[in-house]
């Protein structure tokens, strides 16, 4: 994805960028001041269409500046227009190989079709959809998988029931309930 360094920070400059089909953005690098950028709106939206729902926090993008240098980044914040749902602003965080990052990793429940509790008339309720973790960029999982196939009525699975790699440190209580089977 191409990134253009922008100098104008006034409201009129930002509105002009949006009229030209650009998205104003800020790139944060550890220990430095944020860099103001502009991203092509059509290009970003085409990438965004291919990202699975809920997986944006763990999707790594490559920004290419005017000089041709590449930077691997994560989207830290995205702002949408209320009425049109157009992307209005982006915040990126640059990934540095030897620096740990905090990230929200999506949790996907598998085995819901064959779940014992669902077959008995219950409903699967996923209480937590993301787990906050701290890890190196190379160790970041794209999602966590939680098998709920053997859950019966009124049974639950907790964060500690997931397979979390040793290189990943959870930043939330591992006794939190992720999914539960409830009566209709």
Swiss-Prot record:
The keyword Zinc does not apply. GO terms for biological process: translation. Keywords: Ribonucleoprotein, Ribosomal protein, RNA-binding, rRNA-binding. GO terms for molecular function: 5S rRNA binding; structural constituent of ribosome. InterPro entries: Rbsml_bL25/Gln-tRNA_synth_N (IPR020056), Ribosomal_bL25/Gln-tRNA_synth (IPR011035), Ribosomal_bL25_b-dom (IPR020057), Ribosomal_bL25_C (IPR037121), Ribosomal_bL25_long (IPR001021), Ribosomal_L25_dom (IPR029751), Ribosomal_uL5_bac-type (IPR020930). GO terms for cellular component: cytosolic large ribosomal subunit. Coiled coil: none annotated. This is one of the proteins that binds to the 5S RNA in the ribosome where it forms part of the central protuberance. NCBIfam families: bL25_bact_ctc, PRK05618.1-4. Part of the 50S ribosomal subunit; part of the 5S rRNA/L5/L18/L25 subcomplex. Contacts the 5S rRNA. Binds to the 5S rRNA independently of L5 and L18. Belongs to the bacterial ribosomal protein bL25 family. CTC subfamily. This is Large ribosomal subunit protein bL25. It comes from Protochlamydia amoebophila (strain UWE25). The gene is rplY.
């Amino acid at each position: 994805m191409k990134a253009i360094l922008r100098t104008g920070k006034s409201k009129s400059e930002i509105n002009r960028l949006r009229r030209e089909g650009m998205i104003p953005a800020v790139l944060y690098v550890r220990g430095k001041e944020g860099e103001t950028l502009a991203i092509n709106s059509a290009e970003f939206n085409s990438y965004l269409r291919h990202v699975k729902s809920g997986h944006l926090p763990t999707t790594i993008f490559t920004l290419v500046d005017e000089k041709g240098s590449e930077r691997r980044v994560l989207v830290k914040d995205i702002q949408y227009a209320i009425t049109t749902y157009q992307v209005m602003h982006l915040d990126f965080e640059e990934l540095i190989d030897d620096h740990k990052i905090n990230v929200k990793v999506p949790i996907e429940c598998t085995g819901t079709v064959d779940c014992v509790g669902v077959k008995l008339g219950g409903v699967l309720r996923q209480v937590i959809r993301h787990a906050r973790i701290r890890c190196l960029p190379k160790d970041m999982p794209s999602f966590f998988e939680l098998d709920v196939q053997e859950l019966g009525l009124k049974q639950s699975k907790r964060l500690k029931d997931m397979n979390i790699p040793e290189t990943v440190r959870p930043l939330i209580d591992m006794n939190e309930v992720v999914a539960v089977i409830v009566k209709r």
